UniProtKB/Swiss-Prot annotation:
Main location class: secreted
Quaternary assembly: Interacts with vasopressin receptors V1bR/AVPR1B (Ki=85 pM), V1aR/AVPR1A (Ki=0.6 nM) and V2R/AVPR2 (Ki=4.9 nM). Interacts with oxytocin receptor (OXTR) (Ki=110 nM).
Entry keywords, A to Z: Amidation, Cleavage on pair of basic residues, Disulfide bond, Hormone, Secreted, Vasoactive, Vasoconstrictor
Subcellular location: Secreted
Cysteines paired by S-S bonds: C1-C6, C22-C66, C25-C39, C33-C56, C40-C46, C73-C85, C79-C97, C86-C91
Annotated signal sequence range: none
PROSITE patterns: NEUROHYPOPHYS_HORM
Site annotation Important for agonist activity on V1aR/AVPR1A: residues: G9
Biological process according to GO: vasoconstriction
Modified residues (Glycine amide): G9
Protein name per the record: Vasopressin-neurophysin 2
Amino acid sequence: CYFQNCPRGXXXAMSDLELRQCLPCGPGGKGRCFGPSICCGDELGCFMGTAEALRCQEENYLPSPCQSGQKPCGSGGRCAAAGICCNDESCVTEPECREGASFPRRA
């Protein structure tokens, strides 16, 4: 299930380390599911509500929580592709997610 909408109480308090990446999707499996109808990848950009994202509905039936993307962004989202931030329902453009910004820089 997607981390944001897993059934409450089904799992004990989980640390981020226990979250797996959501299902692969898109051409050649190069994308990751970010929500039931969202498939994104660095090389692909994002597919929303298209055939490439159909597989992402399967994630709703898996019991363990997942979260795709490395860097948090926006309101409860993760960087999904260059310049794009997605949560499990939608995506927005996000300069923080541009290439080269994917890893927090240590001062």
